[in-house]
A protein has these predicted regions:
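A generic structural signal for well-ordered coil/turn residues at beta-strand boundaries
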Residues: 313, 326-328, 350-352
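Conserved ATP-utilizing enzyme core subdomain
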Residues: 163, 324-325, 329
Length: 355
């Protein structure tokens, strides 16, 4: 499959089935490499073009040794803006809500500008963002009455990840990594408890593999939206605030990833908040039970739903610092096994090894 054809697939708008059809026409799938790692990037890791390109470099380093799939949060602060729009709508301040929505759109267009893509790629991604912006504004009418219930809340909240997935896929392609944005509501099936929906894992796995495995086999990095799913009849749901870590675990489970690496803005998991305690100590190794006990004691470890799923599937979870990638981070899992090649490759590249 040529890079030109991969880029054609990444430009496709519409259903995942359309992406798969383009990949099929492009000449079939390449042999999948043995190791598979899921990267989840938090909002602070994606705040602006420079950070996106830095994170893209981490993905690029990992792809030399492994297949990689990426799950993204919204850029830091964007979900709060979107929830503010929902509250403003509930108060009946439609004009103000619409201005807020336009500001969210403008924020992402600034990041697109700062990515400095080629003219063709820039126009393509701008068009994709404008389609999303049109859908966002459709949720925020300029006049009339608006029912601002939980279902609309979830539709509004979903736009942050949908914007960031398109931008990060563009950052990856600029870095030489073929990538496509994938909207998780196309395959993450949930109940209809809006704002805190529970995923149906088995159905999600069946549907998700149909979407994601052809892209993996073709050597394309899927950039999947965290946080969101959909009911069986297609209504967008969210998995609860700060649930993108959980989304990362779900996607890793779908593709049977060897590891889930959660990239954040700290070096790993500490015994206490290092900003509040001089005695805080970085923990390099934790069992699932130890991590669960820390979380139960109130420590900020991971989203509460990550650990049960990781333990059930014996998935190794790493917590690492996007901005200090040479730091080892914290490993959560069963007794230690030889280090995963993707992790070793990143550390080597950060110390002057092959990029």
């Amino acid at each position: 499959m040529s890079l030109e054809n991969v880029q054609e697939a990444s430009a496709a708008e519409g259903s995942p089935a359309a992406l798969q059809e383009r990949l099929h026409r492009a000449g079939g799938a390449s042999k999948q490499r043995r190791n598979l790692v899921a990267f989840k990037f938090g909002g602070s890791s994606l705040l602006g073009a420079d950070r996106m390109l830095h994170a893209a470099g981490l993905v690029r380093a990992a792809t030399r040794a492994s297949n990689v799939i990426v799950v993204v949060s919204a850029m830091k602060g964007v979900t709060d803006h979107l929830l503010s729009i929902a509250r403003t709508l509930a108060d009946g301040e439609l004009a103000h809500a619409r201005r807020q929505a336009e500001l969210v759109m403008d924020l992402h267009l600034v990041v697109l500008r700062d990515l400095q893509l080629s003219e063709d790629d820039g126009l393509r991604v701008r068009r994709e963002l404008q389609f999303l912006g049109r859908d966002l504004l459709h949720e925020v009418p300029a006049h009339g009455s608006v029912a601002a219930g939980a279902e609309r809340f979830d539709r509004l909240a979903s736009f942050g990840e949908r914007f960031s997935a398109r931008l990060f896929a563009a950052a990856l392609e600029k870095s030489g990594v073929p990538a496509v944005p994938v909207t998780s509501s196309d395959f993450v099936l949930t109940c209809d408890t809006f704002r805190d929906a529970q995923p149906h894992l088995e159905q999600t796995k069946q549907r998700g593999r149909d979407v994601l495995l052809p892209l993996l086999e073709a050597g394309v990095v899927s950039v999947v939206t965290g946080f969101i799913g959909a009911t069986p009849d297609g209504r967008i749901t969210t998995l609860g605030r700060n649930s993108s870590d959980f989304s990362g675990a779900i996607i890793a489970h779908v593709v049977d990833a060897d590891e889930l690496v959660i990239w954040t803005d700290v070096d790993g998991i500490y015994t206490a908040n290092p900003n509040e305690s001089s005695e805080a100590r970085l923990l390099h190794e934790l069992s699932y039970d130890e991590a669960h006990a820390l979380a139960a004691s109130g420590a900020k470890v991971l989203h509460a739903k990550v650990l049960p799923l990781a333990a059930e599937t014996e998935m190794v979870v790493w917590v690492r610092n996007t901005f200090n990638p040479q730091a080892r981070g914290t490993r959560i899992g069963s007794p230690r096994v030889p280090e995963h090649p993707a992790t070793a490759r990143i550390e080597k590249s950060q110390h002057g090894g092959a990029a």
